[in-house]
Amino acid sequence: MNGLGRPLPIRPLVRYSSGGRDLLARHLAAGRRVFARLDRAPAALRGTMCRSQPNYFLPLDKAGIDVFTQPCPLRLVLEGTVRGTGGLRITGEDCATTVAGLHAAGDVATRELVTGAASGGGSLNGAWAISSGTWAGRGAARFARSRGPLPPRGELRPAGRAGMRPAGPGVSRPEVDAFVAAVRDRVLPLRHNYFRTARGLTESLRLLDALWEQARDRLGALPEDGRTALRAREAAALAAHARWMYRSAPAGAESRGVHRREDRPATDPGLAHRLLVSGLDRVAVRPDPVAPRRPAEAGVP
């Protein structure tokens, strides 16, 4: 709205362009608001669109927005592994992982085995959630039965440290919240995470590595403060995931999919493989041992 209470004019950014997403991101990163309107959708198809994708139109209906005639605000959302790219590595048909007894399912598990390099959403993700949940549950049950009785409690040793068992005294909830804010400051801004450069990735890693040392040595809560203890462990997981993400990004010295390198705008055919990331204090990145087939081997001229 302008000073007179009248709506400001909306200027079209892009109509039909493969660079529409980047243009949208640049305007959002600059602090501008971006809107969309589906006014070019044929009238005969609008009802079908609403029925076939209710999850898209329902929030707009609740907000009182007719997206076919009115502009609706847009924003970019970080979805982590929800869209089928990345996740815990699956090593067997029972959704086993590289950690004995840990079977992954749903959004937390990698889905490249069923989606390839494409992002999985909608019915594909729903089918994967049901199928992988069934397979993982059976695999976990078989593993548990094969282990026999549990050893006496006194023989068990806890494995987790960061955010749970710090070397020093625990921290307060405000300190945990400040830690989360510091991690988010390197992950959420589009200038850091979407428009990537070698220099920016190096700077993000430097800050995140320092935050990880804090998570390992200081982040934790007193046993009687259960809510802060949970929040501290979540904060440590957030820092770990951010480091995995930014440690693997430099290995992809190209632009591919949603991984955009401002200093490497082209796609490198030699990097058409997945990256495996592991480790906590020292993060390792290596190519997937299953090498991709070359076009000639795949029967493509």
Regions inferred by a protein language model and the residue ranges of each:
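Mobile, glycine/GP-rich and aromatic-enriched active-site lid/loop segments adjacent to catalytic centers
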Residues: 1-120, 189-301
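A generic secondary-structure signal for well-formed alpha-helical elements
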Residues: 137-147, 253
